[in-house]
Amino acid sequence: QTNVSLKSLINDQFSIDDLQITTKEIKLNDIIALVGIFQNSPQLFILDTFVRDGFVTANINLNFDEKGNIKENYKIEGAVKKAKLNILNQFKLQNLNFNFNINKSSHSLKRLDMMLNNIKITSPSIEIEKNKNSFFVNGQFLQGKKNFNIEELKLIFDNLFNNIDIQKIEFSSKNNFSFNVNKKFKFDN
C-alpha cells in the first residue's frame, strides 16, 4: 500500500510519500540473499553461514523524502519462526521463535524461545540500542525447570558429586544481562 502525492506527479517529482509492505512467510536464507544483493557485508556473510532454516514475516513502513530517499523514521515489525542456527559447530539453536520491532535507533526482540544445545531457553525481551559506534544489548534469559541425572553432571563437575547420595538435581535460572558490542561484533563491555 502506498500514498502518492498528486502535486509531485504534476511537477514530475518523486511521487511516493510512504510505502507499506506486508510479507508472507519467507525463508530466512532467501531474505539474507536478497539483502546481500543491496548491502553486502562481512556480518551478512557470517549470518548466512550460521542460518540453517527458518521463516520470517514482516510489516515494513517506509517514508520517502522529495528525492526518493528513505527517511530515518522507518519501522519494521514481524516474527521469526522455526529458525535453526549452527554457530561454529558449538552452539546449536533450534526452534528459535521471536517477534521483533526495528527502527533507526533500536531493535526489540520479544517473546523469544529456543532450544540451545537441547536446553529450552526463553526471554520476555531483549533490547538493542544503537549508539554512535556500538550497540547496547540488554535483556533477560529464563530457563525453566530442568532435571539432570547425577551421572550427566559428573561429566561436567568431575568428582564433585562422588561422596553425595543424590540421584537427580532440578535447576531453573533467571539471568539478566547487558553488554556493549562494537560494529565489528567485538565485545567492549
Label each PLM-derived region with a short phrase.
Residues 1-9, 96, 107, 112:
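N-terminal beta-strand/beta-hairpin edge segment
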Residues 1-2, 13, 87-92, 116-120:
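Solvent-exposed loop/turn segments connecting transmembrane beta-strands
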Residues 2-7, 28-33, 118-126, 147-151:
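A short, polar/proline- and glycine-enriched secondary-structure boundary/capping micro-motif
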Residues 2-4, 55-61, 95-97, 120-123, ...:
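Short small/polar-residue motifs
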Residues 10, 129-131:
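Short, ordered beta-strand-loop transition motifs
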Residues 14-86, 105, 132-189:
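Extended amphipathic, helix-rich lipid-handling scaffolds
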Residues 113-114, 127:
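A short beta-strand motif that forms part of the nucleic acid-binding face
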